[in-house]
């Protein structure tokens, strides 16, 4: 009898653990462009991006500027990130946190939950279609959302018949780090031709620096943008966010 009560209590506790409390998808609203502001110190293509790297200060400024979500690089060797940064910043915000890393094994997904991430990145170029499907299922089962990132036609084809809900279009080719903002439009056109444009929330990633870039992406009706370098290089990212997103300037008043 007591054992049955204990098990029932544990079922209730587990159900609460699985509840999604913070969701990136909730930030996607018609007519609104979601800003995912990234915290990163360096990259293989640019070297050191932020010489006075202070993750907590960066988070505070992103919140002040009106960011809708935060991306945190946790790769140590190539981006000089750390899982500790995510773990330490998690209690300091209620915004969704994306763990930005190269996920190749399920253990990293469980680790992401433990660290406090709400969203993980799955990079189609380094995963098979079967792995993408499996990782999406694991993520959903434990209450994590996932952005599946693609750069070209082959990668887009790979994710079409999976349970992908949030599609990240990387304007940078990770094989040679070349960059073209036009890549977002190109892949959106492919989705349109396939009749699948409305099947996904779409986030444009990389190379977004000026208001003209934001205006261009708004014209494509993407749901969100991920901006890292352009904000990390600024002494005052709040002003930069206001420049890119005039509607967010009211946050400062």
Curated annotation (Swiss-Prot):
Keyword Iron-sulfur included in the entry's annotation: no
Annotated pathway: Amino-acid biosynthesis; L-tryptophan biosynthesis; L-tryptophan from chorismate: step 4/5
Source organism superkingdom: Bacteria
EC number: 4.1.1.48
Record keywords: Amino-acid biosynthesis, Aromatic amino acid biosynthesis, Decarboxylase, Lyase, Tryptophan biosynthesis
GO biological process, one term: L-tryptophan biosynthetic process
Catalytic activity entry: 1-(2-carboxyphenylamino)-1-deoxy-D-ribulose 5-phosphate + H(+) = (1S,2R)-1-C-(indol-3-yl)glycerol 3-phosphate + CO2 + H2O
PROSITE patterns: IGPS (PS00614)
InterPro entries the record matches: Aldolase_TIM, Indole-3-glycerol_P_synth, Indole-3-glycerol_P_synth_dom, Indole-3-GlycerolPSynthase_CS, RibuloseP-bd_barrel
Example of a GO MF term: indole-3-glycerol-phosphate synthase activity
Keyword hit for Lyase: yes
Gene3D superfamilies registered for this protein in UniProt: Aldolase class I
Family designation: Belongs to the TrpC family.
UniProt-listed NCBIfam families: PRK00278.2-4
Family annotation (HAMAP family): IGPS_B (MF_00134_B)
PANTHER family xref list: INDOLE-3-GLYCEROL-PHOSPHATE SYNTHASE, TRYPTOPHAN BIOSYNTHESIS PROTEIN
UniProt protein name: Indole-3-glycerol phosphate synthase
């Amino acid at each position: 009898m007591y054992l049955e009560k204990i098990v029932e209590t544990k079922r209730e506790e587990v159900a609460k653990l699985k509840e999604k409390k913070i969701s990136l998808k909730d930030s996607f609203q018609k007519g609104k462009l979601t800003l995912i502001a990234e915290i990163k110190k360096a990259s293989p293509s640019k070297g050191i991006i932020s010489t006075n790297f202070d993750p907590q200060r960066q988070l505070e400024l992103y919140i002040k500027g009106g960011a809708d979500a935060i991306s945190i690089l946790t790769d140590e060797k190539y981006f000089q990130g750390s899982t500790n940064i995510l773990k330490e910043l998690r209690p300091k915000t209620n915004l969704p946190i994306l763990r930005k890393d190269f996920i190749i094994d399920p253990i990293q997904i469980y680790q992401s939950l433990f660290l406090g991430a709400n969203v993980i990145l799955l990079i189609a170029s380094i995963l098979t279609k079967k792995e993408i499907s499996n990782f999406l299922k694991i993520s959903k089962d434990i209450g994590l959302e996932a952005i599946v990132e693609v750069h070209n036609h082959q990668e887009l084809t790979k994710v079409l018949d999976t349970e992908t809900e949030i599609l990240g279009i990387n304007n940078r080719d990770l094989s040679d780090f070349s960059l073209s903002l036009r890549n977002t439009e190109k892949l959106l056109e492919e989705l349109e031709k396939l009749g699948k444009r409305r099947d996904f929330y779409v986030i444009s990633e990389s190379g977004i620096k000026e208001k003209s870039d934001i205006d261009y992406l708004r014209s494509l009706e993407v749901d969100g943008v991920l901006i890292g370098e352009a904000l990390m290089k600024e002494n005052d990212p709040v002003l930069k966010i206001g420049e890119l997103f005039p509607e967010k300037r009211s946050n400062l008043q």
